[in-house]
Amino acid sequence: MSEQQTCVIDNGSGVVKAGFSGEDAPRAVYPSIVGRPKNVSALIGVDSASEYLGDEAQQKRGVLKIFYPIEHGIVKDWDDMEKIWNHTFYVELRVSPDEHPVLLTEAPLNPKVNREKMTQIMFETFNVPALYVAIQAVLSLYSAGRTTGIVCDAGDGVTHTVPIYEGFSIPHAVSRIQLAGRDLTTFMAKLLTERGYSFTSSAELEIVRDIKEKLCFVALDYEAALKQSHDSSTFEKNYELPDGKIITIGSERFRCPEYLFKPLEMNGKELDSIQDLTYKSIQECDVDVRRDLYQTIILSGGSTSIEGIGERLLKEIENRAPKSINVKVIASPDRRFAVWRGGSTLTSLSTFASMWITKEDYDENGASIVHRKCI
């Protein structure tokens, strides 16, 4: 590895993806969590520590209280976030951050004060030689080989629709809802409770998340699927719990992700659906660019990996778009890593060299330099 190889870190609400510029996939993918013992005696005799990070916190989740430093895409706890970055550099990537330029990702509409805080921590705590902060959706677009399009990015904590024209996001047309993967997991737990299964603790919710990721799909025609599930056992699947018990799941498999398309009807939430969000963002843009956006709708983020979501979104947008437009939804197979891959690609370009915020830039201008260099 060359001394100056860039570290690319995609900070998600649920999962951190980290690796090196120019590579096809992140080397480290782990939960963006910090775990602290519920009571100290619970961990006596184990290699007890006051806190655990990432995979280790996940493994010991039964006796830990789990904290997420990033909520709905925005960093809320900087002390814990610093610990996650420290873990990323020294444990996961095994590098010294003062020897590598770093690209960090951020949610669209990230508060200015947060961008400055990220910049300050990277230069002052980790002594990085250079930094760039990139909007997640723009990187997803690059990873799809486009510079114009609209990205529908649904992760664990937040869903955004971000129109991008010639590589620049259009901030006034960005839309967001606090409905994403974690909400789908909680909703699935609610549906399973109605079936007579109880999942309430943070450890049990991890089981529900696994059920959601392995068994859920989006119905192209929800009403027809619902009728079919009442008339037959077509959709029923078994799932084995960690204790060996088998549970059966049926219509919950498609009722859970329907929440993204009908938040009010499914769970009483007065939020825009993902099709409304996408349509609204496009309509907020100049009439001259709308056709390009309709023809390049890019899915990004782990929550868009649910089977059938691309076909359903296409159907919903076609119902709203002008009939003369050929709507296209692009759903790459490994889109949960689209943001990271875009960062890896971007930092590999020779033209990117002039875009870094260097240590000298930071020393001269302070953290506010991020607003000028990282647009």
From Swiss-Prot:
Keywords: ATP-binding, Cytoplasm, Cytoskeleton, Hydrolase, Nucleotide-binding
Highest taxon of source: Eukaryota
SUPFAM superfamilies: Actin-like ATPase domain
Signal peptide annotation: none
EC numbers: 3.6.4.-
Pfam families for the chain: Actin
Location, primary (coarse class): cytoplasm
One Gene Ontology CC term in the entry: cytoplasm
SMART domains the record matches: ACTIN (SM00268)
Catalytic activity: ATP + H2O = ADP + phosphate + H(+)
Gene3D superfamilies linked to this entry: 3.30.420.40, Actin, Chain A, domain 4
Protein's cellular compartments: Cytoplasm, Cytoskeleton
MF-aspect GO terms: ATP binding; hydrolase activity
Coiled-coil segments: none
Membership in a protein family: Belongs to the actin family.
Function: Actins are highly conserved proteins that are involved in various types of cell motility and are ubiquitously expressed in all eukaryotic cells.
Protein name in UniProt: Actin
Source organism: Sterkiella cavicola
Taxonomic placement: Eukaryota, Sar, Alveolata, Ciliophora, Intramacronucleata
